[in-house]
């Protein structure tokens, strides 16, 4: 079987999966926390649904759902709290990440697209974490609309 043998290959595969899985778990936890910080009536998707991102292949499509539903939930929550925010918060960079991941399967474009997808994923993650931190701030008494 060569120099490292079957056991060595198995160990390398486990290490590789761990390297990929650990950041994904922290990413999902960030998404879940951001959704939990939205009022239940503003959650377009259940916070637990973020864990569907852990399913290989399915996550290629679920990423689009997560990004669009997260943007809708955040937009509704920021509107409820009367906090000014961009329309569909995080949606553009999130969709760029999802599209670049799919483009990573195209021969010759694969490596540059995967690198760009990694950058967009990190930017999206940081952006959602920032929105989540904003929502974690104590809720000020909302002014009543003037009738």
Q: What kind of region is each of these model predictions?
A:
Residues 1-6, 22-101, 116-147:
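Membrane-interface extramembranous regions at the lipid-water interface
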Residues 13-18, 56-59, 103-114:
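Short hydrophobic membrane-inserting alpha-helices and related fusion/pore-forming segments
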Residues 11-27:
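Short, small/hydrophobic-residue-rich motifs at membrane-helix boundaries and re-entrant hairpins
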């Amino acid at each position: 079987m060569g120099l490292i043998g079957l056991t060595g290959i198995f160990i390398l595969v486990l290490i590789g999966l761990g390297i990929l899985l650990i950041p994904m778990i922290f990413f999902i936890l960030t998404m879940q926390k951001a959704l939990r910080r939205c009022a239940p009536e503003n959650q377009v998707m259940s916070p637990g649904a973020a864990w569907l991102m852990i399913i290989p292949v399915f996550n290629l499509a679920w990423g689009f759902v997560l990004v669009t539903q997260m943007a809708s939930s955040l937009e509704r929550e920021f509107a409820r709290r009367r906090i000014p925010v961009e329309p569909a918060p995080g949606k553009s960079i999130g969709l760029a990440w999802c599209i670049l991941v799919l483009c990573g399967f195209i021969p010759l474009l694969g490596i540059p697209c995967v690198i760009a997808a990694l950058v967009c994923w990190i930017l999206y993650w940081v952006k959602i974490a920032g929105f989540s931190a904003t929502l974690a701030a104590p809720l000020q008494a909302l002014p009543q609309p003037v009738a």
